Amino acid sequence: MDETATSSEVTETFVSDPTTRQFEEDGHPPLETRHLNMIHEELEKLNISTDVINKMEVQLDLARADFRETQVQWSEKLKELSKQYSSQIAKARPFYELKIKERSLREESQKAAERFERATSILGIAKQQVSLTQESLSRQTSVLPECLEVLNHHIQRVREVEEERTAAESLHASKAHAMLHLAEKIRAMEKDNRYAIKKSRLYFEKRLEFTKILEAQKATILCLEAEVRQKKNDYTTSLRNLERISERIHEERSTGSLESAVSSDQEDQKSDFKSSESLPGNPPPYAPTAPPPYEDKYIIDKDDDSIVLNMIKTEQEEEGEKRNSRSLGSGVILLAQQLIGNGNSTEKHNITPPRHGEEADISYHTRPVGLSDGSDNSEVSSLASFNIGDDDTVSKMLMSHSELIKDIELATDRVGHILKPNIKSVSNAHE
């Protein structure tokens, strides 16, 4: 107990003193958090075990002192009674010994009776199982070996329970016979020593009370001793855990010193490599980036469904008819302009004036409102870039209003003759 108290004081001072946690005096780095947590946990267990051991040992000492005091007090009382009734106690002692023996026989007989009753109930259940199994086998046309095995198991169980029942019955009978024989002896002794038994009754009653008190105190002492033994085992386990943690810390530090030396060499190599990489060098060569390839989002693959292609074709034909009917007048005018341009192309090729800056490329587009750019020559007329020179050149290119109207009428007639067969083919296709 003193050693445990001193160890508890040492552990408490270790926990309370923060300077002992620092390892700077030995030249070691501070402990990691997980190691500190493990050490703190084991030290808490040590402190708790020490407190419990100290309290239980105090209780154990008190219980032992009470046991000794009770034993001394009752021994003195029994000695006084034995001196007072010495002759009567000597005559009545065999009677009370037989009474104690009778009590033990009664308890054994009670246990044998309970065993017999239990075996009887189990035997009834086993016999019922055997009868049910036999009935089920009698209803079957072909008896399976598994069913026979179950029946044999139930029969074997019945035999075992019958043997248990017979043994319990014989034991109960023997205990009952012994009790009857002992009861006859007790009656005979009580008849012969009635006066001595009556005088010494106080002594034996006090002795029985004294025995009960001592047995209770003895049970308390044994319980406290078992608890103290368990807590001491916990204390030694915590000490061993602390030793393991200390060994682990030393191993990690020894391996960590080697790893730190290797890592320092690697870091030096990396720093040298980074310093060599940090030197300025020539810029990378120029790599021109090409524009992204043209992607036609409206191209239809050949593997597409033929139904979709037919629908698109019919829609395109309907839109073509609408455009032809809607832009007939505008198309006539554009064709007339093209014819006029073709008629004057000879004169344009002969004239090659110099080009000037922004006026060198001029295109004229005349298309109906709402139509998009496409490959249809009837809707878009792109005049070649006119080279504008002096006033004489401009005057040759211009025409009077009346001549332009006549040319437009002639172009209209030509377009009418050209479009008639196309319109007929379209109508036949719709039909």
Swiss-Prot record:
InterPro entries: SH3BP5. The gene is rei-2. The keyword GTP-binding applies. It comes from Caenorhabditis elegans. Disruption phenotype: Viable. Double knockout with rei-1 results in a smaller brood size, weak embryonic lethality and severe mislocalization of rab-11.1 and prolonged cytokinesis in embryos. The keyword S-adenosyl-L-methionine does not apply. Residues 1-21, 255-264 have a biased composition (Polar residues). This is Guanine nucleotide exchange factor rei-2. Guanine nucleotide exchange factor for Rab GTPase Rab-11.1. May spatially and temporally regulate the distribution of Rab-11.1 to target membranes during embryogenesis. May play a role in cytokinesis, probably by targeting rab-11.1 to the cleavage furrows.
